[in-house]
Amino acid sequence: MAAPTETESSDGTAAAPTQEQQSDSYKLRFCTVCASNQNRSMEAHLRLSTAPSPFPVISFGTGSLVRLPGPSITQPNVYNFNTTSYSQMYEELYSKDERLYRNNGLLNMLERNRNLKWGPERFQDWVPGMPRVDHVAKGDKGALGTEGGVVDVIITCEERCWDAVVDDLMNKGSLLNRPVHVFNVDIKDNHEEALVGGKAILELANRLNEAAVQERKANNSEGWENGTGEARRSFDEKVPEILAAWQEKWPNLPALWTLAWL
């Protein structure tokens, strides 16, 4: 009789994964943020959720309204967060002036976005710890792993968005008492720079996750989710070094970092 494999118990059923296997497959959960949850945060959402080894990811905007360019600088297209889908925006702009919005890239951007998730969400309306199982049911890319409504890393794409996120987290009162690393990667708000920024954010995510996996292997993952334990403490201490090494490779994307609490 053949001996059971590493993934099979003696009775032929699937064996529970070992701690080492769990560490190898561990993924940090990410949140990407820009002003309108349209261009920069969604390009990063795409990169993270469709990477060869994808990450759990959610995304938001920090503006009061979703603003997209219109026929002139004084005539933007304005929408509400949380209630207007990317598909609705696409259909409206298509019917208004297909040629204009095709040429300026908005229709292509909205096509990408509606294949990632339902619609733009506002960061200030997010309640950390509130379940997001409906986003899994909707088929949002990156939703698996974010059902619990918590993330480990928030990456904003503009300094004013970083300020808004940090202020909002303080105002929410850290009810979960759970640490979260908040980065800003400064990306100009155009399609070309968003592509570059998305690639850079994915590299930062990979570096952070590699360090997290190493620490969980070396020091046990006990207490990790609560921000306690040797593995978590060691990882948190290494984050500034990881960012500094990343910044050397991406000097044109100035970055900020702070440790905050959900």
UniProtKB/Swiss-Prot annotation:
<dbReference type="InterPro" id="IPR006811">
    <property type="entry name" value="RNA_pol_II_suA"/>
</dbReference>
<dbReference type="GO" id="GO:0090052">
    <property type="term" value="P:regulation of pericentric heterochromatin formation"/>
</dbReference>
<dbReference type="GO" id="GO:0000785">
    <property type="term" value="C:chromatin"/>
</dbReference>
<keyword id="KW-0539">Nucleus</keyword>
<protein>
    <recommendedName>
        <fullName>RNA polymerase II subunit A C-terminal domain phosphatase ssu72</fullName>
        <ecNumber>3.1.3.16</ecNumber>
    </recommendedName>
</protein>
<dbReference type="GO" id="GO:0030847">
    <property type="term" value="P:termination of RNA polymerase II transcription, exosome-dependent"/>
</dbReference>
<comment type="similarity">
    <text>Belongs to the SSU72 phosphatase family.</text>
</comment>
<dbReference type="Pfam" id="PF04722">
    <property type="entry name" value="Ssu72"/>
</dbReference>
<dbReference type="GO" id="GO:0005847">
    <property type="term" value="C:mRNA cleavage and polyadenylation specificity factor complex"/>
</dbReference>
<dbReference type="GO" id="GO:0004725">
    <property type="term" value="F:protein tyrosine phosphatase activity"/>
</dbReference>
<keyword id="KW-0904">Protein phosphatase</keyword>
<dbReference type="GO" id="GO:0180007">
    <property type="term" value="F:RNA polymerase II CTD heptapeptide repeat S5 phosphatase activity"/>
</dbReference>
<keyword id="KW-0378">Hydrolase</keyword>
<dbReference type="GO" id="GO:0031124">
    <property type="term" value="P:mRNA 3'-end processing"/>
</dbReference>
<dbReference type="GO" id="GO:0006368">
    <property type="term" value="P:transcription elongation by RNA polymerase II"/>
</dbReference>
<dbReference type="GO" id="GO:0030643">
    <property type="term" value="P:intracellular phosphate ion homeostasis"/>
</dbReference>
<keyword id="KW-0507">mRNA processing</keyword>
<dbReference type="GO" id="GO:0031564">
    <property type="term" value="P:transcription antitermination"/>
</dbReference>
<comment type="function">
    <text>Component of the cleavage and polyadenylation factor (CPF) complex, which plays a key role in polyadenylation-dependent pre-mRNA 3'-end formation and cooperates with cleavage factors including the CFIA complex and NAB4/CFIB. Ssu72 is required for 3'-end formation of snoRNAs.</text>
</comment>
<dbReference type="GO" id="GO:0001174">
    <property type="term" value="P:transcriptional start site selection at RNA polymerase II promoter"/>
</dbReference>
<dbReference type="GO" id="GO:0030846">
    <property type="term" value="P:termination of RNA polymerase II transcription, poly(A)-coupled"/>
</dbReference>
<comment type="subunit">
    <text>Component of the cleavage and polyadenylation factor (CPF) complex.</text>
</comment>
<dbReference type="GO" id="GO:0032215">
    <property type="term" value="P:positive regulation of telomere maintenance via semi-conservative replication"/>
</dbReference>
<feature type="region of interest" description="Disordered">
    <location>
        <begin position="1"/>
        <end position="21"/>
    </location>
</feature>
<dbReference type="GO" id="GO:0009302">
    <property type="term" value="P:sno(s)RNA transcription"/>
</dbReference>
<dbReference type="GO" id="GO:1902801">
    <property type="term" value="P:regulation of siRNA-independent facultative heterochromatin formation"/>
</dbReference>
